Amino acid sequence: MLGSSAHGPAAREAGSAVTLQQTAFQEDQENVNPEKAAPAQQPRTRAGLAVLRAGNSRGPAPQRPKTRRVAPLKDLPINDEYVPVPPWKANNKQPAFTIHVDEAEEEIQKRPTESKKSESEDVLAFNSAVTLPGPRKPLAPLDYPMDGSFESPHTMEMSVVLEDEKPVSVNEVPDYHEDIHTYLREMEVKCKPKVGYMKKQPDITNSMRAILVDWLVEVGEEYKLQNETLHLAVNYIDRFLSSMSVLRGKLQLVGTAAMLLASKFEEIYPPEVAEFVYITDDTYTKKQVLRMEHLVLKVLAFDLAAPTINQFLTQYFLHQQPANCKVESLAMFLGELSLIDADPYLKYLPSVIAAAAFHLALYTVTGQSWPESLVQKTGYTLETLKPCLLDLHQTYLRAPQHAQQSIREKYKNSKYHGVSLLNPPETLNV
């Protein structure tokens, strides 16, 4: 009895401790995911994820201290005397605000009205030199009648409105005619390719260059590029080949990069690089095209604003009396024919080729000759243009038999008035 009584309290305390531990263990385990509570029943995971999880093996996460829930705005005490005040605001005593109460209407009516001067009147009264404006005077009638020929803008004819909305070309600004022409004449000398560069090329010939230019004409028509883009691309090619030796397997890559640069310089929406890779039938990769573009830019020293035959023709067309669209299209056709053959046209400046093309087109369509106004503007006479004019006339005569026909097919379109189908004159009166 004594033994049982001696061990009774200790046993009861030990039993109660075990019971508390079990209860605490159950309380800790009741919020644990059942799948995590039995790790032996988990499915096998991928090796990668298992390695990541093994590296992150740590003890149980420490329990976060219980924080007080943020009270919503409606539960926050307002104007409570027991709200603690920060020490930096304790000494900042401000007078309590008061609520304004409107007076009754009867009291307002009983209050006598007082005439108060405004601040502006006080200031004006202080300065005796300033006088208040007097009463407004009626407007005096006009002594002369208005022009009755002026029409209301709501009754104007649409033709007048359309005429005002026409964009003005840069070349049609008379104040800058001479400056533009002088600048182009100076730049064409600086951007001129070397005449006999093809003789120093070990692996390419003039016929290969002609095939390349013919292909670029087709590319321009396929993507509806400007004619100026084609002229710029050919200029870039000739200037690049004047300084670099190129194998025949890379000649098309040079032409593609030159056309890409010209389209970026001239077009509003140039084709993407992937389009130029596609037109080469994936002969070159995008990386090769971009590398060649970078090389062409370095060789040309980033000087891309080269004067072309097309630019000079645009200026010469302004001297037609009257303007003739067929003459303009034929002159552009002859100018592009000169791009095909490096020999003999590399020895002529673009302004000279453009002048010869314009005279030949004018003579073919209308029978007229090189205008006197252009003689004064350019300084070129028929005697000056005669060598280039004879070469261009021979090219025009042999165009139907030329191996490259893309330019003739292009100018058969009604857009260019089918000028490539016109018969060239047999002789020239020069």
Curated annotation (Swiss-Prot):
Chief subcellular location = nucleus
Q: Which UniProt keywords apply?
A: Acetylation, Cell cycle, Cell division, Cyclin, Cytoplasm, Mitosis, Nucleus, Phosphoprotein, Ubl conjugation
Q: PTM per UniProt?
A: Polyubiquitinated via 'Lys-11'-linked ubiquitin by the anaphase-promoting complex (APC/C), leading to its degradation by the proteasome. Deubiquitinated and stabilized by USP37 enables entry into S phase. Ubiquitinated during the G1 phase by the SCF(FBXO31) complex, leading to its proteasomal degradation.
- Which residue ranges does the record annotate as region Disordered? 1-80, 106-129
Q: Kindly name one Pfam family recorded for this protein.
A: Cyclin_N2
Question: Single GO molecular-function term?
Answer: cyclin-dependent protein serine/threonine kinase regulator activity
**Where do the TM regions start and end?**
none
Q: Where in the cell is it found?
A: Nucleus; Cytoplasm
InterPro entries in the record, alphabetically? Cyclin, Cyclin-A_N, Cyclin-like_dom, Cyclin-like_sf, Cyclin_A/B-like, Cyclin_C-dom, Cyclin_N, Cyclins_cyclin-box
Subunit organization? Interacts with the CDK1 and CDK2 protein kinases to form serine/threonine kinase holoenzyme complexes. Interacts with CDK1 (hyperphosphorylated form in G1 and underphosphorylated forms in S and G2). Interacts with CDK2; the interaction increases from G1 to G2. Interacts (associated with CDK2 but not with CDK1) with SCAPER; regulates the activity of CCNA2/CDK2 by transiently maintaining CCNA2 in the cytoplasm. Forms a ternary complex with CDK2 and CDKN1B; CDKN1B inhibits the kinase activity of CDK2 through conformational rearrangements. Interacts with INCA1.
Q: Per the similarity annotation, which family is this? A: Belongs to the cyclin family. Cyclin AB subfamily.
Record protein name field: Cyclin-A2
